[in-house]
Amino acid sequence: MLFGDSDDLTACEEAGLMPRHQVQFHWKNQHPASGAPFADFDDFLAALTQDKRKKIRQERRKVLEAGVTFRWARGTDITPADWAFFYRCYERTYLEHGNAPYLSPAFFDAMARDMASHWVLFVAERGGAPIACSLIAVSADPASAGGQNASETVAYGRYWGALERVDCLHFEACYHQPLDWCIRHGVARFEGGAQGEHKMARALLPVATHSAHWLAHPGFADAVARFLARESAGVDGYLEQLDGRSPFRRPDA
């Protein structure tokens, strides 16, 4: 069982499954002071500490001064040419790291045909030509970490790639543009996945996630259970350590 809520986890433990606790990094569309959704991207920036706010503004300025603009497309507004360009970028990202892409063009063709409304593409253009892009998934499905409300719209990201190198373009395409889109469209949360404490500088904060597992071999299951107990203590300490590194301003700052 993956990404269950507390009730799911309790039921699984009662059934004899072994719980595992991990950490992901999520952004919430919620002002830390008022609790209301952010009014716009500037409102989000204003909630950050001065150094984090300054760094993001510098990054965005570099991309703008490089002559790069962005185009957003969702669902059927993502054209076949857009999907083809995305796959070129996606494939290049993997090849640059010496790996073959694990999703095929046929997969994305199926997504465009059967689940178009669940995808948003951010295309970076310079001189009228596309040079990079990122792709996020969007869903109102509550099947994600923590058992969130079904009425919430959640974004999941992201795939990315570039055919040209531009300073800070990765941050703009993968974080600033998607977060801006989420704010404008009332998305409750952007789940950035596991790993990467650097995501905290973009206000993606650590969140505990939960899974449960069963192994048929008693000896192997016992060894894994002992490991998970040690790992759980480490995860608790890790979350406590990260808790003091919030990028948001304190109420009195």
Residue ranges of model-derived segments:
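A conserved beta-strand-loop-helix scaffold within acyl/acetyltransferase catalytic domains
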Residues: 1-168, 213-214, 246-253
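Conserved GNAT acetyl-CoA-binding A-motif
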Residues: 1-2, 182-193
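Residue-level detector of anion-binding/catalytic polar loops
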Residues: 69, 188, 205
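C-terminal catalytic domain of photolyase/cryptochrome flavoproteins
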Residues: 81, 88, 94-97, 185, ...
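Short, hydrophobic/aromatic alpha-helical segments in well-folded domains
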Residues: 89, 107-111, 174-179, 195
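Conserved acetyl-CoA-binding loop-helix of GNAT-fold acetyltransferases
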Residues: 165-182, 191
